[in-house]
Amino acid sequence: MRQTSSVPTDAAEDRLAALARGDKWYLADGCGAIWAPPFPVWLREPGFWDPANFFELAFGPLFCVAVVRADGMGVPLVQTRRDWRPDRLVSTYTTPDGMELTETKAVLPAGRFRSSWTWTGLKGTAFLVAYSAQTPQPDAKYTRTPDGRSIQWEGVATARNERSRSRGVELRLSAQASPDAPHASSVQRCQSTTCHPEWRLSPFPESWEPGVGLAPIEFMPGIDDRGLDWLGLSVGIEGETGQGVCFELDATLHEPGIEADLPSEQHWHEHFDSYPAFRCGDAFLERYFDYRVYGLHLCEVRGPAGNLKHPAVAEGIEYFHSPITYSGQCHMLETRWSRSPRVARGTLLNFLDNQKPDGSFHGRVYTSALINTDFYHANWGDALLAVDAIHPDAAFLRRGFDGLGRYFDWLTQSRDPEQTGTIEVTNHFETGQEYMSRYQAVNASADADGWVSRTRLKGVDATVYAYQLASALNEVALRLGDDAAASRYTEARKRIGSAITDRMWDPDHKLYSDLEPNGLSRTGVKAAVCFYPMLTDLPDTAQVDAMLGHLQNPDEFATPWPLPSSALDDPYFSADARWQGKRHLCPWNGRVWPMTTSHVIEGLIRQYKRRDALPDATRQRCGELAGQWIERFVRMMFHHGDLARPNCFEHYNPFTGQPCEYRGIDDYQHSWVVDLVITGMMGVSVRADRAGGATLTLDPLPGVLPQAEIHSVWVRGRSLTVHREGTAYWAELDGQRQASTIGQPIQFTLPPADAAPVILDAGRVPPPRAGKPTRPPAEAM
């Protein structure tokens, strides 16, 4: 395997240290291996006994560590302290006789689960023993090194996803310690009983050799393959104080014979160094910016592994630890701000690599078989242009254009065969927004039908996504010089845009609406997705003003924490996650979902920047509300307002801000925040032109921050810094500085992309190139 590396900076260390806390335990290698059990049972025990994930595949237990006396008796450990930061989890233990031990857990690239130990107060000698229990397999092979330092365990296919598909996993348990320390290993097969990480329940105490450690019993398979295989390594320790004992479980799932491109052991520092640094007068906003940067790497996955060939971001932990289309749009917006474009591009490329023959996408890219992968609507058009604007690449743009063109054809032909310009939703899961009035309005049993496609709803969200995709494909076609394709997508864009404007706008409710499929009558259901047309260039002044009225109405959407997924006056509304009286895991009938909130804030930012289409008063309202909501949105994602405890759960109570902790899924990458800060708070936007160049515009939101600065924003290989102070701000692009006031944009002209330096990886900083500053256009002054 290859490992990229660079020298980490002090700034990255400071950013990691600032996220330290005592109530968290998630660890990941940034490649697909992650230890983040939602409800850990054995968190107070040494090692990794609770399950881990390799991509979508769960496996466990891994291993635990015991302190054992020379005579084989286990020493009770009491965990007295736990300190977490993204790159490690440090636990302190004490024993009844006054010994104190410190364990440092980490998950390193290539699925290496490491437990390192130091101690003080040891009297005499003792042993540290790492051991694991695994389900036997007929073709499993066990190899022990003669020095007793490692056990290789091959061919075990116990890693499974939630749909019971499995892949083989190779495990190697090893020990690192002083060459003089006694080492021993043992593998024993036992009939099944409870599988707890308690030394006294393992088979090893009864085969212990006093003063030597584990007895090297010859492995015997027994009369059948049922039961548990126990693997153990013992290391002798002595001295009042000591260090240097390390146990490591290497779990391998990468394709055999294929060399994986892995980061170095400093991968967390390299990751933070690759993203802009943001500082501001709002401690919560500043902290959360880096917390989202952390979440992106926690959920990063890399191939090659089965169907996954490119780096990407998984939607979350546990069974969400795979690329999913619905959140893929978010990840492309967020990760485009890394110096390296690999993850942003890879997010789309993984779906294109596995595109179905009919042009549709798998909803999830599993490393295992692509069966029952579902389907989700997503805003691929905006995501493609967003990545290309920051990291232009002709080959990627062409690949995206061709693949998304096929997807668009499938979407419009299968979900709008009558060519009405509206896109059909066929069940309540494929929008990612189940259990809400939208679907009940056209199918009274939509909630009970599940994934069965009995619902027919012309969805605002799905139709807006189609409009944005047609617009993006039209723009790319023009840049590629494909006039025929440009003409075709222009017509499609007009057809879909007219349907949104003429059919989906409800003049009575003054809000966009879903449509029933037959007569295309409006359902009148008020939901957060009804504001998604603000992502487009379609709404006029009256429509934007009307939508602002709904968003600021305390009887509809103006809750303390923005934005309820369904209006407060919806007959099914519930703030506490109840649907039909029963608390659900993922209801959308009133809870605040960061996904929809980031959509609507993004729409407000875009309307604020429509200087050529909307009057200043309307734009100002959009900008002020966007800024206020970014602050409230971010503040919501801290446990009880505690600055040290940011989170990102799936959904929240709109009145109290209480997250769905009962669900157990924290650090859910199902929204965007980094992009809102950079494009909204700091006003950065980039628009490519047909000649291959681009215009960089700075237009920060009004009245949100007294002071803020972001630096190391990499735009087409150039370094950008933006600083705002009160109503003044300045931007510097590779030494070229311009100053202005909030409300007056700054622009830089960037030359064609082929003149920009190539960024090879996140650890390498490209040399600076100056952009040409220009005055903003007259209408922006």
Predicted regions and their residues:
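Terminal accessory carbohydrate-recognition/targeting modules of carbohydrate-active enzymes
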Residues: 1-283, 606-621, 665-668, 684-781
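Non-catalytic carbohydrate-binding regions of carbohydrate-active enzymes
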Residues: 480-516, 546-717, 761-781
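Short, well-ordered alpha-helical packing segments
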Residues: 129-132, 150, 155-157, 176, ...
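Active-site-proximal structural scaffolding
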Residues: 110, 188, 202, 212, ...
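Substrate-binding groove/exosite segments of carbohydrate-active enzymes
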Residues: 224-227, 267-405, 513, 525-536, ...
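The feature captures the catalytic groove of carbohydrate-active enzymes
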Residues: 232-238, 242-257, 317, 362-379, ...
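Active-site acid/base region of carbohydrate-active enzymes
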Residues: 280-301, 335-338, 351, 356, ...
